[in-house]
Amino acid sequence: MVGIVLAGGSSIRAKVNKLLLEVDRKPLICHTINTISPFVDRVVVVTGRYHDELCKVITNAEIVFNSNHEKGMFSSVLAGAKAALGNNVLLIPGDITNVNEASIESLLKGSKNIRIPSYEGVTGHPVYLAKEIVSELVKEPIESRLCDFIAKHNNEVEIIEVNDKFINFDVDTIEDYNKLRKEFTL
């Protein structure tokens, strides 16, 4: 299994590279990598605008540069999926840092080809994609969206309810980062 960490965004709302913001003296991106590492054989971090800066702090993952990062998040999903072809995947944005182990274990115990965690009826990350789905995903045009791809494969989707608010907590703004630092233990 391959963990794909999406780190190709521009952090427009945060106005700084949010993935390099530190909690417990570690950049957020490192927390995300450490969250999924125990469950995968390798981690692929898909970078974009902040490639050089991220390369300086990522030591325990393969790095793939998405030359199309300005085309949006799905372009990074595609870059990661191409690097993971032939493998099952755990897909997670780089700013979702503190998903608990039980949530990931629940995803891995599921039975369908696409497994999405849900907390109080709201879906989140990471998303599990079976290798058969990854093979279909890489055929999608770069203008697509992951939610549209998943909708086309609705009969293969399993929503797995978890008791984990962190599946939905991403850091989009400095206020989110401050909330993470204050309220959440990493």
Locate predicted features.
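Conserved beta-loop-beta/alpha segment of the NTase-like Rossmann-fold superfamily
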Residues: 70-135
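Structural beta-sheet core signal
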Residues: 3-5, 44-45, 90-91
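Cofactor-binding loop segments of dinucleotide-utilizing enzymes, especially the Rossmann-like FAD-
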Residues: 6-8, 48, 94
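Short, well-formed alpha-helical segments that are part of the catalytic scaffolds
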Residues: 18-19, 23-36
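Conserved N-terminal catalytic core of the sugar/cofactor nucleotidyltransferase
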Residues: 30-88, 101-102, 150
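N-terminal nucleotide-binding beta1-loop-alpha1 segment
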Residues: 1-16, 154
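Conserved alpha/beta core of the MobA/IspD/sugar-nucleotide pyrophosphorylase nucleotidyltransferase superfamily
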Residues: 141-186
